[in-house]
C-alpha cells in the first residue's frame, strides 16, 4: 500500500504511478510548494512601458521550447499595472497553463506574469530546483496533466489541478545524484549530436 501526504498533515491510501525506493515518498505537490496564477492588466497596450525603469513583462513568447531558463524579456509594463498582475522574483518556477500547457521554466529575472502562467515558489526546503525542473518535465507529471484536463473543451491547467499531482520525492542528497546522472547523460547526447552533424557535413 502507498500513502500520500496532504497539506493538513493527514495521509490517505493512493494509487501511484510506479514503485519507488523505500527512502522516497509519493507526495502531493501542494504539500511542497506554493502555486499562484498570473494576471493581466487590460487593455495591455495601455500598460506597456518604453521607459527603462518599467517592470519586466514575462510572456510565453520570451521562451524557447526545450530551454530551462527565461533570461530576457522583450516588453515592460508600467508600475501602475502591478496591482492587476502578479510580480515574481528570480528563481521562481513558471509553468504554462494553456495552449502548450505544462512546460516548466526557471526565471533568471524579476518581473510580472500574465494569466497564461502559473508561478511555483517556496520549494527550496524539499526540492532541489534542478530536480524540480526535471520532474516537471517528465512523462510521469505530463501524463497526470493530460488526465486532469481530459474531456475539457479548453485544455487549461489551473493551480488546483497542478497542486493535486503526485511527484516522487527522494531525499535531497539523492536528488543531487539524480541531477548529476541526468546532466551527464545529456552531455553525452550533445556529444553524439555534434559528431553526427560533423559526419553529415562530410557526406555533402
What are the residue ranges of the model-derived segments?
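Structural signal for hydrophobic
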Residues: 24, 58, 91, 164-165, ...
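Non-catalytic DNA-recognition/assembly elements of restriction-modification systems
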Residues: 7-40, 168-204
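Sequence-specific dsDNA recognition surfaces
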Residues: 9-15, 30-47, 61-90
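A short beta-sheet element
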Residues: 59-61, 73-137, 158
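Short, glycine-/Ser/Thr-/acidic-enriched flexible segments
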Residues: 25, 34-37, 62-65, 100-101, ...
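Short proline/glycine-enriched turn/loop segments at secondary-structure junctions
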Residues: 47-48, 108, 153-156
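Specificity-determining recognition surfaces
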Residues: 118, 138-167
Amino acid at each position: 500500500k502507498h500513502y500520500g501526504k496532504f497539506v493538513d498533515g493527514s495521509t490517505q491510501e493512493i494509487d501511484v504511478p510506479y514503485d519507488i525506493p523505500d527512502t522516497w515518498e509519493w507526495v502531493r505537490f501542494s504539500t511542497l510548494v506554493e502555486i499562484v496564477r498570473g494576471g493581466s492588466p487590460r487593455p495591455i497596450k495601455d500598460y506597456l512601458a518604453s521607459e527603462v525603469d518599467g517592470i519586466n513583462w514575462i510572456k510565453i513568447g520570451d521562451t524557447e521550447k526545450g530551454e530551462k531558463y527565461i533570461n530576457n524579456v522583450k516588453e515592460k509594463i508600467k508600475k501602475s499595472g502591478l496591482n492587476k498582475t502578479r510580480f515574481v522574483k528570480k528563481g521562481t518556477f513558471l509553468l504554462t497553463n494553456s495552449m502548450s500547457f505544462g512546460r516548466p521554466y526557471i526565471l533568471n529575472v524579476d518581473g510580472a506574469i500574465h494569466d497564461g502562467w502559473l508561478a511555483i515558489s517556496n520549494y527550496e526546503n524539499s526540492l532541489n530546483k534542478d530536480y524540480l525542473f526535471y520532474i516537471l518535465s517528465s512523462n510521469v507529471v505530463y501524463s497526470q496533466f493530460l488526465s486532469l484536463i481530459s474531456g475539457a473543451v479548453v485544455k487549461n491547467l489551473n493551480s488546483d489541478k497542478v497542486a493535486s499531482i503526485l511527484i516522487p520525492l527522494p531525499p535531497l542528497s539523492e536528488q543531487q545524484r539524480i541531477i548529476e546522472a541526468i546532466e551527464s547523460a545529456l552531455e553525452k547526447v550533445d556529444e553524439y549530436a555534434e559528431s553526427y552533424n560533423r559526419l553529415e557535413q562530410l557526406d555533402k
